[in-house]
């Protein structure tokens, strides 16, 4: 089944100018909208940004000027100074945009990314096999490899997918983004003088892990609360790998047709990130044994780099923890 572009809405979420400490490449959102008109003619464009943003000349089909929920307090340092992240801004701009979608399919894209092709549309249905016991989405959701991490500090980790780009059924994207806002972390006076954050004194989860853990636990009550970045077990790792094989299609940006601004483009593939071949091997293992991919194929591209770099990353992390 081919998907008609008119059955797709594209939610562009985030600021269109530099905002609250986040820099923005001038004209990038204009470029984003123009790229959608070029590569998805007939699709509905929804820009979901903030009150007070100058949207002159952007001309989306639907413009949402959301009330800014502000940054979320997620930590306190030893001096009691709060650390903040944009958890709720990401949720509000994404979820409110998706709630305006009336088409069966939707794209969620950052306001500082753009399209270079529409290859992701066909890719969404190119890997139809599922592991029935692991199906949480109605159909596959396409996401990209950039910042989708398999390793942190030389260790395998779980629940750290990329949040740059999603394409799939609108109902499935809402499963990811329509989640409750995160409350500010309250300062605990009994822990004054020590850092306070999720997982302390261990290394706290990455922001993407916290998002993913929230929506995955909403979909499956057996998923544990992720206390720290490296929380893992053979059972949890297998669960996560089955999930991404059965519910996602993980592609390189160029396979999707996703354009990234310069600061998101690495000089070479990062060894700690998943690659499409990694995902394809998991898809073969859990969903479709006929797929032609092997561990040696991965070794020839990124595997040898991991063998060289990950042990040193692990040793460096352990030394850092000892110094604490």
What are these regions (language model features)?
Residues 1-30:
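N-proximal low-complexity "stem/linker" segments adjacent to membrane-targeting elements
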Residues 7-12, 36, 44-47:
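Hydrophobic targeting segments
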Residues 28-43:
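Short, acidic, metal-binding catalytic loop of nucleotide-sugar glycosyltransferases
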Residues 48-100:
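Active-site-proximal specificity loops/subdomain of glycosyltransferases
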Residues 109-110:
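Active-site acidic Asp-centered loop
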Residues 115-123, 127-281:
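Catalytic core and acceptor-binding pocket of nucleotide-sugar-dependent glycosyltransferases
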Residues 265-324:
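Membrane-proximal basic amphipathic "stem/tether" segments
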